[in-house]
């Protein structure tokens, strides 16, 4: 590894990532002489790249599409990475390559910061059953949420996600959503519905309780129709950009030894980049 601690983002493609903006901001803010780079690595070349990560001068890495599952297999994963089935953060300890999934911490950290009155002792409805949903469900289980209703078009995929958690996670269909919403203290959209270029999420926020919290993992656009409607009702909301920022905290801490803060100034910087792009 180089004397200057350096981390990278590995993906294919990877040029669209905002991670360099986030980590370079923290390096400068904390006065750390480090660096963060982008590495575009084809799937076929990924195993060799990981095997030579330290030799290339890196103290760790973020991993994005399509490498997250392979990163899990090529490292020593923690409980979060194993539960989610994917690793997005790699780091060295005692010359061994370890991995975690910081989406779990990112989701919960953003929820705590953006919707401070959300309650972990209340039921939750999670929409979608992909990789993001796995991180959300594991995070909610860690925090003690008693029951999670998992809604997905493919019941089989939802059942595979729910199975390890027993009765605490139940599978529901989209036809069940209207009956579930009035009982839920938290609703989380992990699907691409509402994203730029995608249809909006068909969810009636009028059915939610006045003390409910609505989280949307989409961050382009910053304010989805779902979050706009929820805020219009006076409900607490948490957006996808907040999760992106909070999930970066743990990786930075593992690589550079300092735990950074998600500040309004950092958020404004990334928001400006999203607007330009």
Swiss-Prot record:
Alphabetical list of CDD domains matching this protein: NAD_bind_Shikimate_DH
Q: What class of enzyme is it?
A: oxidoreductase
Q: Name one GO molecular function term.
A: NADP binding
Q: Which residues bind shikimate?
A: 17-19, 64, 88, 103, 219
Biological processes annotated in GO: amino acid biosynthetic process; aromatic amino acid family biosynthetic process; chorismate biosynthetic process; shikimate metabolic process
Give a single Pfam family match: Shikimate_DH
- Keywords per UniProt: Amino-acid biosynthesis, Aromatic amino acid biosynthesis, NADP, Oxidoreductase
**Out of the domains of life, which is the source?**
Bacteria
Residues involved in NADP(+) binding: 128-132, 217, 240
Q: In which pathway does it act?
A: Metabolic intermediate biosynthesis; chorismate biosynthesis; chorismate from D-erythrose 4-phosphate and phosphoenolpyruvate: step 4/7
Catalytic activity, EC? 1.1.1.25
Q: Name one GO cellular component term.
A: cytosol
Active-site positions on this chain: 68
Q: Which reaction does it catalyse?
A: shikimate + NADP(+) = 3-dehydroshikimate + NADPH + H(+)
Summary of the function given for this chain in its UniProt record = Involved in the biosynthesis of the chorismate, which leads to the biosynthesis of aromatic amino acids. Catalyzes the reversible NADPH linked reduction of 3-dehydroshikimate (DHSA) to yield shikimate (SA).
List, alphabetically, the NCBIfam families matched: aroE (TIGR00507), PRK00258.1-4 (NF001312)
* Quaternary structure and interacting proteins, as annotated: Homodimer.
Family note: Belongs to the shikimate dehydrogenase family.
What is the designated name of this protein?
A: Shikimate dehydrogenase (NADP(+))
From which organism does this entry originate? Afipia carboxidovorans (strain ATCC 49405 / DSM 1227 / KCTC 32145 / OM5)
Q: Which gene encodes it?
A: aroE
């Amino acid at each position: 590894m180089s004397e200057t601690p350096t981390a990278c983002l590995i993906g294919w493609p990877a040029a669209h990532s905002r991670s360099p903006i986030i980590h370079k901001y923290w390096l400068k803010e904390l006065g750390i002489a480090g660096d963060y780079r982008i590495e575009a690595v084809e799937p076929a070349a990924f195993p060799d790249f990981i095997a030579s990560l330290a030799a290339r001068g890196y103290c760790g890495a973020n991993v994005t599409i399509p490498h997250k599952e392979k990163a899990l297999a090529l490292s020593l994963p923690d409980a979060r990475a194993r539960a989610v089935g994917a690793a997005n953060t790699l780091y060295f300890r005692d010359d061994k390559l370890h991995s975690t999934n910081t989406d779990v911490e990112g989701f919960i950290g953003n929820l705590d910061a953006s919707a401070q009155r959300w309650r972990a002792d209340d039921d939750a409805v999670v929409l979608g059953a992909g990789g993001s949903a796995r991180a959300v469900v594991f995070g909610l289980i860690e925090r003690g949420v008693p029951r999670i209703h998992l809604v997905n078009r493919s019941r089989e995929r939802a059942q595979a996600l729910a199975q390890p958690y027993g009765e605490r996670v139940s599978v529901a269909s989209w036809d069940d959503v209207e009956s579930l919403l009035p009982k839920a203290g938290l609703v989380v959209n992990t699907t691409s519905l509402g994203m730029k270029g995608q249809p909006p999420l068909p969810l009636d926020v009028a059915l939610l309780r006045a003390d409910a919290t609505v989280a949307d993992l989409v961050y382009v656009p910053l304010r989805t129709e779902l979050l706009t409607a929820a805020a219009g009702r006076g409900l607490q909301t948490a957006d996808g950009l907040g999760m992106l920022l909070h999930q970066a905290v743990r990786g930075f801490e593992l690589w550079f030894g300092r735990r950074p803060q998600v500040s309004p100034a950092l958020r404004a910087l990334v928001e400006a980049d999203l607007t330009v792009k």
